[in-house]
From Swiss-Prot:
It comes from the Viruses. It comes from Psittacid herpesvirus 1 (isolate Amazon parrot/-/97-0001/1997). Its main location: virion. Keywords: Activator, Host cell membrane, Host membrane, Membrane, Transcription, Transcription regulation, Virion, Virion tegument. This is Alpha trans-inducing factor. Residues 484-496 have a biased composition (Pro residues). The lineage of its organism: Viruses, Duplodnaviria, Heunggongvirae, Peploviricota, Herviviricetes. Belongs to the herpesviridae HHV-1 VP11/12 protein family. GO terms for biological process: regulation of DNA-templated transcription. Residues 499-525, 598-607 have a biased composition (Basic and acidic residues). Abundant tegument protein. Trans-activates the immediate early genes.
Length: 607
């Protein structure tokens, strides 16, 4: 696939198609977002899986890598009724019964093998985080911090990138706290621990809520995934607020020797106030309302845990808004704590996004082109770009270190071998059942669309979608707008058109028969103005300003029309309004009336 990016128009070039990404559903998708969607699209091939192994072999492989409740017989019983779904209580019972966290066993094994190979420790991870942030502060904010941790030559570039990606899985409970007083320090660490427990519950809930068959049309599963996407998008905005608060704390410190650098809110275009950032308030928005509206019933435990995690992260960001770093040790501790919390949240969101991109995209409407999914990926791509954007040029700095690194769906699927084995088994089983029934599996077939079919689908959406308003927000990370959700505010009422107070007097004014009413209308601004002018004055006619030469031109045109009517044997009654045609409210002129105005004398002499 060849892509050609154009920042001015946002056009992606696909063989045979040229798509301009301007619509309400797809909301100004950046080029990197579509590239991410196309690259991460998992092409499911049940035929290839059945050629490599039999169905029984695929089932045996999946059973050895998955927890017992995933392939148990109790899961399929809930999909035989009219409303195929797994009850919320059953999912919670599976989550609470997984004391050993078997849902993440394969990922833990993969990352611990990597840690053993490269021999990395927690202190080195904190040094790496400080080195990355110090370099970013020097390049983008023009702030030279009094400490430098050199990481060049310690590990290879690929190993350093792997360390950043695996931080969430290897060191999830070792997020430090910035230097604060004893009560505040204890409250901060307690909040971080509670947030970590909430993330584990959300991840395990998503792991166990999957249906047993990819061809089952489960509305509740689609609603739960939509609520997860809203949660991920809101947390991406919280992550932006966290970096904004950390940048602002560094810029307020004494280490900023006259630099005019901006925090992330300056790049967004917002300004700071005494209670935090405008972006933080913008990111909170109506995420909770959208989650409750998406899952009104049937998923109470998941919804409450999502809201609890959002509230806990909001509290942590609020603590960072009031952070002060005036000493060298305070700055080192603050950077290590801020980067640790950011990597904790980024790893959590990366797990949820990859699970949706790999498994739950089967039950999403439009699959990989679902507007909520594209909005979530857009927020992640946009945040990564903003963290490397200079406040002077407003361009992404290619040499700035990437602060947030995460696996894509292809890498994650290779590491999460249990989910990959389950996907191969259930898709092969659904394919064989559909072949016996002489039909095509709809969801599996939709996951294997060609590039031309996907681009044609996008073009169809763009043609059917109305044009977005000019005042629509262009930042996907600073707003909680969701394309396929109803508007949170009612549309404004249409403007009330003003009507004339006295139609009868208005007609007399236009005919020039009521001079006193004309003067009165000129004083109070109601009605239309008559054309009583001199050569050096101007008038208002129908809300427009007309100069004296234009009025003389219109009077000459009126004289010509009146003379032509008299040549035909009739007469034409013109109101004293500068030669303008009479409105429908005016009475029709009488054919028996005679014109005695001074303007008609030249035509009378001519006749």
């Amino acid at each position: 696939m060849s892509t050609k990016s154009s920042p001015a128009r946002g056009t992606v070039y696909i063989p045979g198609h040229a798509m301009t990404l301007r619509s309400v559903e797809l909301k100004k998708i950046p080029i990197k977002v579509l590239k991410t969607v196309f690259e991460n699209a998992q092409k499911i091939s049940p035929v290839w899986s059945l050629e490599q192994a039999s169905l029984n072999s695929l089932a045996a492989t999946a059973e050895t890598m998955l927890p017992g409740p995933i392939l148990g017989p109790s899961r399929a019983e809930h999909f035989n009724g009219p409303d195929p779904t797994i009850p919320d209580k059953m999912v919670v019972r599976m989550v609470e019964g997984d004391h050993k966290m078997l849902f993440r066993a394969t990922l833990d094994d993969t990352y611990h093998i990597l840690v053993t190979r490269i021999r990395v420790r927690e202190k080195f991870v904190q040094r790496l985080a400080r080195a990355m942030y110090t370099r970013r502060a020097s390049m983008l904010m023009d702030v030279e911090l009094p400490f430098k941790d050199k990481m060049e030559g310690v590990y290879a570039a690929a190993d350093l990138e792997a360390i950043c990606k695996m931080h969430y899985w290897v060191f999830p409970h070792t997020v430090p706290a910035p230097n604060m007083k004893s009560p505040d320090d204890k409250a901060y660490l307690t909040s971080v621990a509670q947030f970590a427990r909430s993330t584990k519950f959300i991840e395990s809930y998503m792991y166990y809520m999957r249906p047993h068959d990819p061809e089952v049309n489960s509305t509740d599963t689609g609603n739960r995934v939509a609520a997860m996407l809203i949660y991920i998008h809101g947390m991406q905005c919280k992550l932006a607020s966290l970096f904004d608060a950390l940048d602002a704390a560094i810029l307020r410190s004494k280490f900023n020797a006259g630099s005019r650098g901006h925090s992330l809110s300056g790049i967004y275009g917002f300004t700071r106030n005494g209670k935090g950032t405008m972006m933080a308030a913008k990111s909170s928005g109506n995420v909770v309302e959208q989650i409750r509206r998406t899952c009104p019933f049937g998923s109470d435990a998941m919804v409450e845990c999502l809201i609890s995690a959002l509230d806990r992260m909001t509290y942590l960001v609020a603590r960072w808004e009031l952070m002060s770093v005036d000493k060298r040790d305070d700055a080192k501790a603050a950077i290590a704590a801020g980067m640790g919390l950011a990597w904790l949240l980024n790893g959590h969101l990366s797990y949820l996004t990859n699970m949706i991109m790999t498994v739950y995209v089967l039950w999403l409407p439009e699959h990989y082109l679902n507007p909520r999914l594209i909005l979530t990926i857009s927020s992640r791509v946009l945040l990564g770009q903003l963290l490397c954007t200079s406040h002077t040029t407003f361009r992404e700095n290619a040499t700035c270190p990437k602060m947030l690194l995460a696996q894509n769906a292809v890498e994650w699927k290779k590491q999460e071998r249990g989910t990959a084995a389950w996907l191969d088994y259930v898709c092969a089983r659904a394919w064989l059942r559909a072949s016996r029934e002489n039909r095509k599996p709809a969801n599996i077939t939709a996951m294997n669309n060609t590039l031309e079919e996907i681009s044609a689908h996008v073009l169809k959406i763009l043609e059917e979608a109305p044009q977005p308003a000019a005042s629509a927000p262009s930042s996907l990370c600073a707003t909680n707008y969701c394309p396929d959700s109803p508007p949170s505010r009612p549309p404004p009422p249409p403007p009330v058109q003003k009507r004339a107070k006295d139609p009868g007097r208005f007609s007399r004014i236009m005919a020039g028969d009521d001079r006193r009413a004309s003067v009165q209308s000129r004083e109070d601004g109601s009605g239309y103005m008559t054309c009583e002018h001199t050569a050096s004055t101007s008038t208002k006619l129908r809300g427009r300003v007309l100069s004296a030469p234009l009025i003389r031109h219109r009077r000459k045109s009126a004289e010509g029309l009146q003379g032509a009517a008299k040549l035909r044997g009739g007469s034409l009654r013109l109101p004293d309004n500068g030669g303008r045609a009479a409105l429908p409210s005016e009475p029709p002129p009488s054919s028996e009336s005679t014109d005695t105005s001074p303007e008609a004398r030249p035509e009378t002499d001519h006749k």
